[in-house]
Amino acid sequence: MRKIAIILLLLAGVCANAQTVVPAKPQKIYKKQDNKGILYFEESSFGALYKTNGWGFFYNKTKIIHATKKKFWEIEFNKTKHEKETKTESVFTQGGPITPKNYYYGKINSLYTISYRKGYTKVLTEKSLRSGVEISLNTSYGVSLGLVKPYELMLIYGDQTTDNITFKTEKYSSLNASTFLDQNSIYSYAGTWQGFFDMKPMPGATARIGLAFDWATFDDNITTMEIGLNVDGYLLNVPLMAVAKNHQVFPAMYVSMRFGNRK
């Protein structure tokens, strides 16, 4: 009985010590959900581009076929300029009906284009890490609608040595060619909206090839820079200049930035 009592006293002491020991609370580990490896089906993005002969902006919709191949369509609005366009300062100072604006000497029309393209993306190198860069080859082609808008100037008519002069806003024609191309008769550029309702359509086609670099931080984001070659062609020569050769085909290098998301 004495041995049993001693054993019970020892067990009671162990239990008492065990009750005073508080088990360590496991530390919480917070980790941002990782989307790496998630299968995406489509992309939506918008962007802007600068060409060696103009600028534009666009919307892109892409369907992901598999990991290395995609197909897309995009619609774009851009402005194309002639390589001989040079901004000229008016020879007149303040004192007329408006402050003179600089103008492009010899320019007779502006060209704006709405294009629809479809194409394919070939992924050349996938991102190996979250901070990596994906490189792709994009090729596309489509149709264009060129809008040729008259470039209007404010011209001076009459004897400039007297007050017997008249200011007229006019577009280029065979009747006013001598005045339109006389810098001493050009007072100012008339403004961007002048000639808007006199635009004429010019059908055409477009094609593009470029390398795209996507370095977005997360897989569901798109942050892409693309560089490449763009070619726009029209049914007829586009009359942009009166003092230089006009063209039917407009090749140009371009760089674009595109932002969007995948889902």
Language-model features, listed with the residues they occupy:
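Flexible, solvent-exposed coil segments and beta strand-coil junctions
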Residues: K32-F41, V91-N102, Q183-T192, G233-L236
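Outer-membrane beta-barrel translocator/channel fold
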Residues: F77-S115, G119-T121, T125-L129
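Residues on the lipid-exposed face of transmembrane beta-strands in outer-membrane beta-barrel proteins
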Residues: A48, F57-K63, Y116-K122, Y141-L145, ...
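Outer-membrane beta-barrel transmembrane domain signature
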Residues: S140-M225, N230-A242, N246, F259-N261
